[in-house]
């Protein structure tokens, strides 16, 4: 998998990009995330955890390489996800890099429909289990102990662009890796994070 990602990045790096083909912007959104686990055959899913994402994005017109309407977009985001439970919650903050191949369907000069999908990689930079004990908050680190820091998954987006600058979208992303580091003799433990989000971006 790492070789595939490196090969894709190498191909993108060799493409000659003109100023007209590349746009930059800022992006942010609201997350509704869930932590899903399966231990010893028992499935547990958290309630929705409300987080956020914020960062910068770049978009490259791919019409010259495929057909009219195709584009490649990449973002560098701080993405706060996690899970909520009765009396506790989990904060999972990732430095995340999604790279999507998308298609733009233009209805008029001012309105376009956008659809895109692709992989993402994430590095956990903040991870805490937060529990209330006797009225006090007890925080426990999770990355490197309960969960691994590296995440890899798929990302899907659907939205609109108006006036060639403002983008509004809905998205969904989910882990493909088992994030759990918990080991139970004679059994298995699996943890994944899913996230539904709404967001906006302003392109310069």
What does each model-identified segment do?
Residues 64-70, 164-170:
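Repeated loop/turn-to-beta-strand initiation elements of outer-membrane beta-barrel proteins
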Residues 24-28, 54, 72-76, 99, ...:
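Membrane-embedded beta-strand positions of outer-membrane beta-barrel proteins
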Residues 32-54, 147-148, 181-187:
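Surface-exposed strand-loop-strand hairpins of Gram-negative outer-membrane beta-barrel proteins
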């Amino acid at each position: 998998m790492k070789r595939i990602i490196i090969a894709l990045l190498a191909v993108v790096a060799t493409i000659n990009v003109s100023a007209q083909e590349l746009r930059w912007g800022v992006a942010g959104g609201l997350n509704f995330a869930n932590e899903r686990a399966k231990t010893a055959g028992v499935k547990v899913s958290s309630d929705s955890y409300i987080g956020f994402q914020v960062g910068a994005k770049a978009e490259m017109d791919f019409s010259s390489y495929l057909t009219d309407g195709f584009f490649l977009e990449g973002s560098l985001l701080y993405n706060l996800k996690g899970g909520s439970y009765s009396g506790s919650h989990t904060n999972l903050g990732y430095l995340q890099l999604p790279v999507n191949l998308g298609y733009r369907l233009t209805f008029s000069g001012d309105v376009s429909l956008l659809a895109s999908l692709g992989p993402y990689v994430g590095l956990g930079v903040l991870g805490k289990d937060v529990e209330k004990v006797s009225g006090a908050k007890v925080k426990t680190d999770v990355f490197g102990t309960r969960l691994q820091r590296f995440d890899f998954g798929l990302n899907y987006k659907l939205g609109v662009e108006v006036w060639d600058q403002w983008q509004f979208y809905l998205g969904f992303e989910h882990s493909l890796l088992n994030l759990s580091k918990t080991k139970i003799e004679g059994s298995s433990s699996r943890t994944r994070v899913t996230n539904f989000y709404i967001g906006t971006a302003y392109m310069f």
